[in-house]
A protein has these predicted regions:
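Class I SAM-dependent methyltransferase Rossmann-like catalytic core
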Residues: 28-41
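Amphipathic alpha-helical repeat scaffolds
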Residues: 169, 201-202
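Non-catalytic substrate-recognition/targeting regions of SAM-dependent transferases
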Residues: 1-29
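Short, solvent-exposed polar/charged micro-motifs at secondary-structure junctions
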Residues: 5-7, 190-193
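Generic structural hydrophobic/aromatic packing signal, biased to beta-strands
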Residues: 6, 15-17, 72, 153, ...
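Beta-sheet entry/capping signal
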Residues: 3, 12-14, 55-60, 152, ...
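A short acidic, Gly/Pro-enriched loop at the edge of an enzyme's catalytic core
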Residues: 191-201
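Conserved S-adenosyl-L-methionine
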Residues: 38-189
Length: 202
C-alpha cells in the first residue's frame, strides 16, 4: 500500500506521498529499551556534532540499551542506517521476547518501493547498484575493523538489565562479536586501557 498524507488549511490542501514508510529513525535493531530511550537518528546527529571519528576511543559510562555505541559502530563500519529494511543482510534480526515494538525488517522496505515508477527496470537496477556499492563499502570497513576491540567502542551501565538489552541490540544490529560493556556505576567507571604500541601493562 502507498501511504498518502494531506495537510489541510482554510484555503488549500497539500497532498504528500510517503516515500519513507515507517519512520526512518527505526533502524530495525532496537526492540528493547530503557525508560528514556534516545532516538537512533538523534544519537547519530549528536555523535557527528561532537566531531568523533571512527577509530577514536568512545566510552559511554551510562550506555543504557546502547544507542550511542551502536550508532557509532555502524558509522565506523559504513553500515547505512536503512541497511536492515533494505534487505542488505542474509537474515533479518530476530526480535527478543521483551520486544516493545515490532522490528523493522526487509519486508517493510521503504515507501518509495511501492510507487509505480520504482517498478521500472531502470529504477530496480539503480536500487540494486546502490545496495551493492554500500555492501562493498561495508566489507572494506569490516577488514579495517575486524573485531569489536578494533572499534575502540565500549560502555557500561549500573543497570544489569540495560546491559543485557545492549548486548541483544548489538547482535540484532549485525555488529561483530559481543560489545565491550559491563555493569558498573558511572562514578566508578573507567574506559578500557589501550597502551601504545610496544607498551604492556603487567
Amino acid at each position: 500500500d502507498v501511504r498518502v498524507q494531506a495537510h489541510l488549511t482554510a484555503t488549500q490542501v497539500t497532498i504528500y506521498l510517503d516515500t519513507s514508510g515507517e519512520a526512518l529513525f527505526k533502524r530495525g535493531w532496537r526492540d528493547e529499551k530503557g525508560d528514556a530511550p534516545l532516538k537512533e537518528n538523534l544519537a547519530a546527529g549528536i555523535l557527528s556534532f561532537t566531531g568523533w571519528k571512527p577509530g577514536q576511543t568512545l566510552f559511554d559510562p551510562m550506555c543504557g540499551s546502547g544507542t550511542f555505541l551502536i550508532e557509532a559502530a555502524q558509522m565506523a563500519l559504513a553500515i547505512p542506517p536503512g541497511a536492515i529494511r533494505a534487505g542488505m543482510y542474509g537474515d533479518d534480526a530476530k526480535p527478543s521476547r521483551l520486544a516493545y515494538r515490532p522490528l523493522i525488517t526487509s519486508a517493510h522496505g521503504f515507501g518509495f518501493q511501492r510507487l509505480k515508477p520504482f517498478n521500472e527496470s531502470a529504477e530496480q537496477k539503480r536500487w540494486v547498484d546502490l545496495k551493492e556499492a554500500a555492501l562493498a563499502g561495508m566489507l572494506a570497513k569490516r577488514k579495517q575493523y575486524p573485531s569489536v576491540d578494533s572499534l575502540n567502542i565500549s560502555g557500561g551501565d549500573i543497570n544489569e538489565k540495560l546491559v543485557s538489552m545492549f548486548r541483544g541490540n548489538w547482535q540484532r544490529a549485525q555488529l561483530p562479536d559481543q560489545p565491550m560493556v559491563r555493569q558498573v556505576d558511572a562514578l566508578a567507571a573507567k574506559p578500557p586501557a589501550n597502551p601504545t604500541d610496544g607498551v604492556m601493562l603487567l
